[in-house]
């Protein structure tokens, strides 16, 4: 036995992901049903396409996130504690969150409590009262969280990096400032909810232990009063060119290390070469066998933590390489990250490295499908990013069929280092260097 050589990968066993069936409620809500009787649990994901952070008024940044968080803070018939207690009695939970473009109501329950859970979902969705005392508590908690975040170099780097990518576009907003949080209260939360939480173009996914013929009438009755046309056009698409390229220093005196973020805009998730680009970026910077890990960390010791990934928005993507490094290694780390991107573009990708990355990505995808909630989240992503419903069913085969040339071509098209924004949070003395 040679312990220096890892055992060969086992062959991938076929695993067919079921497709949901599509229905439409009388009020126009699209419902995707995915029955799965293996466990007595039901998962819900309700995606609302025009209620995310990008729809904040510039003077009221943070309103969309607060609206989502506080929808479960009280209704005319339930307090926040009663909502949480009732969901707990049903063996589940309920909450609402906002991302960049969309808001999502997430709920789960034991299938024995499906009917009362649909009523609880409807109450939280349709009748939030935004009690002033709960709003005040949320504001205080948010202020405390913001003050903590602004002491952390990773947050400061991402905040500046968003501006470098998107300029004045709403996607650049990462978090509110303290003054913005004081400008709105319960009335503004109610107005945002009334304007943005509409059934038109909303999609509700239900996965788990239920009979669709029984569930659909329950949902139709519970959501019957939810009416309203589409509220607005989607947020304008951002320019496809990175707003500010080159070195950008965020001074943080007395820092013993620097936080680096490098990257540029790239096509959205539903672009034709998106999967090839995901493969290239995973090979570059995902996991302990990626090129950035093996060179920047293992070979040169410039950083303990280093990696690369793609962030996706509705109509654009962003390539991000990130590292934390000692101040004296800052410029060397940036140069080495750029060098690895150049190598990815210019040198052929070895077959074994390509296959190892494909296996890694397929394996992570399969792990995400183990739980019912994971399957529900996959289809939620398909809804948010405009992917075909069979995308995740085809994903392993599509990924396995990609060639090294396709991955390299996507990298060459979208990852040109001279177009990168380079954001560094660290010592003011770092300045700009030739990197």
Where are each of the predicted segments found?
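Structural motif
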Residues: 57-58, 149-155, 269-275
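N- or domain-start disorder-to-order transition segments that initiate the globular core
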Residues: 2-42
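Residues that act as N-cap/strand-start positions at coil-to-secondary-structure junctions
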Residues: 15-17, 88, 244
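Charge-rich, well-structured scaffold segments of protease-associated domains
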Residues: 1-8, 24, 82-232, 299-435
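Solvent-exposed coil/turn segments that connect beta secondary-structure elements
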Residues: 36-38, 49-51, 75-76, 110-112, ...
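M16/MPP (pitrilysin/insulinase) zinc-metallopeptidase core fold and M16-derived inactive scaffolds
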Residues: 43-108, 151, 286-302, 313
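His/Glu-based metal-binding/catalytic segments typifying zinc-dependent metallopeptidases
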Residues: 29, 34-52, 61-63, 231-290, ...
């Amino acid at each position: 036995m040679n312990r220096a050589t890892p055992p060969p990968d086992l062959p991938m066993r076929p695993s067919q992901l079921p497709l949901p069936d599509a229905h439409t409620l009388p009020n126009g809500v699209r419902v995707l049903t995915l029955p799965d009787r293996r466990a007595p649990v039901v998962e819900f994901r309700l995606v609302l396409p025009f209620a995310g952070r990008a729809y904040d008024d510039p003077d009221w940044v943070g309103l969309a996130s607060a609206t989502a968080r506080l929808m479960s803070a009280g209704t005319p018939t339930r307090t926040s504690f009663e909502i949480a207690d009732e969901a707990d009695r049903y063996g589940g939970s309920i909450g609402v969150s906002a991302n960049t473009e969309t808001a999502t109501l997430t709920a789960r329950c034991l299938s024995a409590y499906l009917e009362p859970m649909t009523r609880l979902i409807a109450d939280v969705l349709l009748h939030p009262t935004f009690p002033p005392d709960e709003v005040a508590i949320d504001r205080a908690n948010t202020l405390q969280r913001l003050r903590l975040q602004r002491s952390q170099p990773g947050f400061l780097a991402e905040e500046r990096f968003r501006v470098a990518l998107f300029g004045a576009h709403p996607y650049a907003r990462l978090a509110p400032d303290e003054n913005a949080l004081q400008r709105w209260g319960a009335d503004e939360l109610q107005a945002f909810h009334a304007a943005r939480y509409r059934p038109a173009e909303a999609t509700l996914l239900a996965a788990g232990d239920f009979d669709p013929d029984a569930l659909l009438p329950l949902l139709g009755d519970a959501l019957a009063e939810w009416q309203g046309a589409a509220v607005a056009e989607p947020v304008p698409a951002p320019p496809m060119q990175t707003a500010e390229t080159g070195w950008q220093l965020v001074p943080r005196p007395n820092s013993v290390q620097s936080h680096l973020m490098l990257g540029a805009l790239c096509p959205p998730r539903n672009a034709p070469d998106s999967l090839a680009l995901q493969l290239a970026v995973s090979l570059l910077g995902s996991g302990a066998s990626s090129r950035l890990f093996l060179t920047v960390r293992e070979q040169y010791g410039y950083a303990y933590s280093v990696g690369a990934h793609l962030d996706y928005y509705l109509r654009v993507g962003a390539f991000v390489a990130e590292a934390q490094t000692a101040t004296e290694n800052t410029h060397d780390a940036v140069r080495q990250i750029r060098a690895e991107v150049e190598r990815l573009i210019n040198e052929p990708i070895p077959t074994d490295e390509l296959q190892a990355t494909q296996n890694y990505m397929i394996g992570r995808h399969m792990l995400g499908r183990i739980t019912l909630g994971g399957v529900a989240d996959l289809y939620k992503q398909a809804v948010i990013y405009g992917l075909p419903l069979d995308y995740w069913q085809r994903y392993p085969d599509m990924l396995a069929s990609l060639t090294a040339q396709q991955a390299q071509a996507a990298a060459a098209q979208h990852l040109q280092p001279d177009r990168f924004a380079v954001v560094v949070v660290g010592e003011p003395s770092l300045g700009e260097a030739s990197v």
